[in-house]
């Protein structure tokens, strides 16, 4: 699936295309997509394909097309503090974006069939927390991943506000998925080649809406053990954060608010990340043709308008070239600067920065 929008040159360009095509429609979803570079979830040597609107698979590693993830994120109607379950969590790309919207008091769980993919997801999550410039701009609900078949979840597992299944669900498994959902919750999953949004309106009542025609590989059926029974999979616990973790969240929030107030007082607006300029297409000169004997000879049709357009294009190209030559200043991490200026032991400062290296 995919190919609904033009390929981008980088992550921001891809998001611009998804917005223009109305796959991304809300600000929170846009911010999450811009914060997580899709290319970071590709293996080395395959990143050139990261910004195309196409699915990608290598061994057990799989990423759906960007247009699919966009529709899923919009259909889930995510809000801070909700609980989310990703059935077939894969690389963790979607779960990480969801975590940016859920915030620190949400629940973010994923179950994935392949243990090597879970390890890959954990590596990518650790890399995002340690190195991404976006991490300090959000309050994050860190995903927790477990290995297992999502059709073997223990019957006494807790329910969730939002659920997404990233594999084709057969009709006889539809009710199994619905049971995992809280009343008032939203389940998004592919059923019979339709990405479907299901709202649980009551204990035994549901509302369904088809979102998009899709083609997903079906869910892998569970194997029976030596006793002829299925192994059950335990989901991560819904743990309450400890006091130390809560203190870190509120200190970072207070400092972030203080920075925003400082910038407002100075009349400095928060700048959005600079977008790559789209290059203007240069128009061709129009020629007129005259007959000289038996030959058709092209003659340039010079006009003031043609000359003005050519001069404007040249000036813009020269300006873009000169701007490209200017060395870019590295972005300042004001939150980190505030933390490092606090009168605290270095070990506490490191804890407040999540031990990030920049």
Swiss-Prot record:
Compositional bias annotation for Basic and acidic residues: 319-339
Gene Ontology molecular function terms on file: protein-L-isoaspartate (D-aspartate) O-methyltransferase activity; ubiquitin-like ligase-substrate adaptor activity
Catalytic site positions: 64
Annotated spans, Disordered: 300-339
Biased composition (Acidic residues): 302-318
Entry note about domains: At its N-terminus, contains L-isoaspartate and S-adenosylmethionine (AdoMet) binding motifs. Also contains an extended SOCS box motif, where the Cul-box is separated from the BC-box by ~90 residues, within its C-terminus.
Family statement drawn from the similarity comment of this UniProt entry: Belongs to the methyltransferase superfamily. L-isoaspartyl/D-aspartyl protein methyltransferase family.
Protein name: Protein-L-isoaspartate O-methyltransferase domain-containing protein 1
Organism name: Gallus gallus
Organism placement in taxonomy: Eukaryota, Metazoa, Chordata, Craniata, Vertebrata
Gene: PCMTD1
């Amino acid at each position: 699936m995919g190919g609904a929008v033009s390929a981008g040159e980088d992550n921001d360009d891809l998001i611009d295309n998804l917005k223009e095509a109305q796959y991304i429609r809300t600000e929170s979803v846009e911010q999450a997509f811009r914060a997580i570079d899709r290319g970071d979830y590709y293996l080395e040597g395959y990143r050139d394909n990261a910004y195309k609107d196409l699915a990608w698979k290598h061994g057990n590693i799989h990423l759906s097309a960007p247009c699919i993830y966009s529709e899923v994120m919009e259909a889930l109607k995510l809000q801070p503090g909700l609980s989310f379950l990703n059935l077939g969590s894969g690389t963790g790309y979607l779960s990480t974006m969801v975590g940016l919207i859920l915030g620190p008091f949400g629940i973010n769980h994923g179950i994935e069939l392949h243990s090597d993919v879970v390890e890959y997801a954990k590596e990518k999550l650790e890399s995002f927390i340690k190195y991404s410039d976006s991490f300090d701009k959000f309050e994050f609900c860190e995903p927790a991943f477990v290995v297992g078949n999502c059709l073997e979840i223990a019957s006494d597992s807790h329910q969730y506000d939002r659920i997404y299944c990233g594999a084709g669900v057969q009709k006889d498994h539809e009710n199994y998925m619905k049971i995992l959902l809280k009343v008032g919750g939203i389940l998004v999953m592919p059923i019979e080649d339709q990405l479907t949004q299901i709202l649980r309106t009551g204990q035994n009542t549901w509302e369904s809406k088809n979102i998009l025609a899709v083609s997903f590989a079906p869910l892998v059926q569970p194997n029976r053990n030596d006793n002829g029974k299925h192994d059950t999979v335990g989901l991560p616990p819904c743990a309450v954060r400890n006091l130390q973790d809560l203190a870190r969240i509120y200190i970072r929030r207070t400092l972030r608010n203080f920075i925003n107030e400082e910038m407002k007082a100075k009349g400095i607006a928060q700048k959005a990340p600079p977008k790559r300029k789209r290059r203007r297409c240069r128009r061709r000169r129009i020629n007129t043709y005259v007959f000289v004997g038996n030959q058709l000879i092209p003659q340039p049709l010079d006009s003031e308008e043609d000359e003005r357009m050519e001069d404007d294009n040249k000036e813009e190209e020269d300006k873009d070239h000169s701007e490209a030559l200017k060395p870019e200043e590295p972005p300042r991490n004001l939150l980190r600067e505030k933390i490092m200026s606090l009168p605290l032991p270095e070990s506490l400062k490191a804890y407040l920065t999540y031990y990030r290296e920049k």
